[in-house]
Amino acid sequence: MEDRVEISMLMDFYSSLLTEKQRSVMALYYDDDLSLAEIAELNKTSRQAIHDLIKRCDKQLLSYESKLNLLQKSMRKEKYIMNFLEELKEKYSVSDKDYLMFKEKLENL
């Protein structure tokens, strides 16, 4: 998985475990795609300080994932649901309407 995409996905799961400042900087960098210089200017700090904060947060998010595996479990669940739905559609000729209904119900589990 590409690092930037992986960190963005980890933010979805673990951002509430970061401080408000960390969440803000990470959102500006990963979601809003601002440069380190732009974020530093907004936070009235140095580019190096922002770089260090982002790297620390990246490590922290990866550490949370290595312990809790929420992203991995979610991706495994998503894959299982998609495989199950495809099998259901192929074996039992499920209509597109029913397929979407089943998909929605399974995703809400």
Swiss-Prot record:
Family to which this protein belongs: Belongs to the UPF0122 family.
Protein name (Swiss-Prot/TrEMBL): UPF0122 protein CLL_A1244
Source organism of the structure: Clostridium botulinum (strain Eklund 17B / Type B)
Segments traversing the membrane: none
Disulfide bonds: none
General function of this protein: Might take part in the signal recognition particle (SRP) pathway. This is inferred from the conservation of its genetic proximity to ftsY/ffh. May be a regulatory protein.
InterPro entries: RNA_pol_sigma_r3/r4-like, UPF0122, UPF0122_fam_protein, WH-like_DNA-bd_sf
